[in-house]
Amino acid sequence: VGSEEEINDWCSQGKVEMQATGGRPLEVSAPQYFFFNAPYVMKDFEHFTRVWNGPLGKKAKEQVEKNGKQIYVGIVYRGLRQMTSNVPIYTPAEVYKMKLRLPTVKTWIAVWKGLGAEPVPIPLPDLYKSLKEGKADASEGDLTQISSFKLNEVQSHLTMTNHLVQTGGILINSGFFKKLAKKDQGLIL
């Protein structure tokens, strides 16, 4: 149907009523709260949930509704993100000059650049091919992604970095939501 970026924009515009997505709504509509999706900030899902359900999470959700015209219906835990490569990675210094495949998430790119890696934004459908052809030396993702993409066929090492508590958001366009009957709104929230 469209990329994550396009679907997020369409949901903000009311062209799509609901979406299941990653951190794009925060990145676009509440960038000051993007730390919720930044590497090495949250130690586990319980920690994430405590902060998300607290005052900072409330402010982040309010900003997404105000600026992005979307309401968070829920959060889905997608696992901890790990790294794959063809060389062992024991310390952050070993990612120096490594071409690391990343999604087009500004915060993630900035963090990995700060660690000395050379981020290569590659769409997820091209992940396997990019590693096989050497366009990227390494990748990062949750274990389900690593397994389902069969990255063991093109990468010899898996490093359990747990560098990001990966969550996904389920959001509804606020204009669409407000037009629903109160009982239907209650079913959604």
Predicted regions and their residues:
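N-terminal secretory/targeting leader peptides
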Residues: 1-48, 55-189
